[in-house]
Amino acid sequence: MGLPELLFMSQLVAPDEVPRWIPGQLTLDSVPVGWDQVTLKGYQYTSLDVEIPSMRDYMLVRYKCDDAVMSRRAGGAWRSERVGRGVCSLLTRGESSQWKWDRPIDVTHIYLAHTELCRVAEEVFERSVSDVGMEDCVRAQDDILPGLMSAFESELESGGLGGGLYRSSLVNQLCVHLLRR
């Protein structure tokens, strides 16, 4: 990795730094159990209007609350969607944006490492992949993603025999699913 890439990476926000920009009550955290390539965090938030800096990882949000209006902009007009239980939002890495919502929300965040998504993309496309783009989406129309995110959450809360292998399988499923989108 060259100097420009190292400087860019040093300016990106890691999952543990998110509360500096989006203050909320932490309800779940995979960091103490040492998950690799993916971090799961749960939060309860009041209604907020926040600037989200450039993230190091891809960020997926699953809503576990009653309906709220979620709005996003990145240098342009606001885009608003109704979100609620079972709905997901997608945020790419390396781009800042502004988000706001009109009422308290309960969410699960999954942060997926760029290196992991690129690794899986290399296997899928059978060639070297240095970057994968993902378009921000306030309301992802996706029947699979909420279930995958729920499986990660269940694994964190309950665990069990073969936990590392199971989690690795979930990471692979998540990466392939995102690449198909």
PLM regions: where:
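Exposed alpha-helical structural elements
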Residues: 17, 116, 144-147
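Amphipathic alpha-helical segments enriched in hydrophobic/aromatic residues interleaved with Lys/Arg
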Residues: 127-173, 177-181
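N-terminal regulatory/effector-sensing and dimerization cores
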Residues: 20, 26-130, 159-160, 164
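OB/S1-fold single-stranded nucleic-acid-binding modules
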Residues: 2-22
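Hydrophobic alpha-helical transmembrane segments
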Residues: 2-4, 28, 174
